[in-house]
Amino acid sequence: MPISSKLNQRVRARLREEDFEHFSDESVSNESLDERESNEDTEQDNRDQRETDDDDTEDDGHTEISDINPSLNTISFGALAKAQAALGKRKRRTTSTTDITPKRTKVLSRQSPTPSTSSNKEHDQGQGLSEFQKHLASNAKKPPQKLTHRTSKHAPTIQSSRHAVSRKRTIIEPLAAPKPRDPRFDSVVLSHSTNGNPSTAANADIHARNNYAFLNHYRTDEIAELRKQVSALQTKKKKTERDDHEIVRLKREITSMSDRQRAFERKEMEREVLVQHRRREKELIREGKKSQPYFLKKGEVKKEVIAKRFTEMSGKEKQRALERRRKKVVGKERKEMPWGRRGVE
């Protein structure tokens, strides 16, 4: 390149950094202003276009109305009445089929998109209605469930967790009520009567039974006296209603006392059977015939008691016991039979 051309070149002074930043800011601001002006122009154009479209639609509507008016004038009143009746029936059907309240329809209209003629959108709207109904049904207040009864009498009582705690508080606890105590079967009295001997204290009930054995004779005497009173009232010539009630009361008392005495005798016989069995087992172990004792079960004890009572009975008592036993067995067998065969012997 020749030197003359280089000398003829124009040289511009170098800008500082501050001047460069100022220049760049001005350029950016100018560009933003241009963009805003262009956006405003486009918005103005869109508004003008919308206004023209609205004017066109209004003109079209006016023309359509003007076209419909002369056609309505030619329609007869009978055709209008039929059309109104048909429209009324359709409206009733639609209102009867839909059980949605106006509030729900407003909510659904807000939530649903713009209406369309396509079947897919109608199906989606129906699904939306059903889902909304399910949601409202789930959120509805359920009736309060009643408390169920206890599974058994040993189970704790059922109470609602919302049950309010009583505001009353026990400041002073009442004194314990005095309880009656029978000294015959009291452990404190029996331990003193045995003089602190542990072997006799373990059999305190046996000692109490031996100490108060005379009460059994009193019971037998009382039962005999009550039977005499019953026989005297039954043989009375002029019996009143009060006498009849007294006879019933005395008979009830006799049966209760005799049952109590019979139970006491049965327990005594069971105790004697156990004592005799223990003695035999101890003798066998002492003789070396056995290494370990055999302990009777409750069923075996009952069988031995029945056998012992049967041997001690007289002839008539045995016959009565056997007859009662036979009737009991027959009744059990008849219950197990089918209903049609129960009457046939």
UniProtKB/Swiss-Prot annotation:
Pfam families, alphabetized: RRP36
Biased composition (Acidic residues): 32-43
Subcellular location: Nucleus, Nucleolus
Composition bias, Low complexity: 78-87
Keyword presence, rRNA processing: yes
Extent of Basic residues compositional bias: 143-153
Coiled coil ranges: 219-267
Single Gene Ontology BP annotation: maturation of SSU-rRNA from tricistronic rRNA transcript (SSU-rRNA, 5.8S rRNA, LSU-rRNA)
Cellular component GO terms held in the UniProt record: 90S preribosome; nucleolus
Main location: nucleus
Region Disordered: start-end pairs: 15-167, 312-345
Biased composition (Basic and acidic residues): 15-25, 312-322, 330-345
Reported function: Component of the 90S pre-ribosome involved in the maturation of rRNAs. Required for early cleavages of the pre-RNAs in the 40S ribosomal subunit maturation pathway.
Record text on subunit structure and interactions: Associates with 90S and pre-40S pre-ribosomal particles.
Protein name in UniProt: rRNA biogenesis protein RRP36
Gene that produces this protein: RRP36
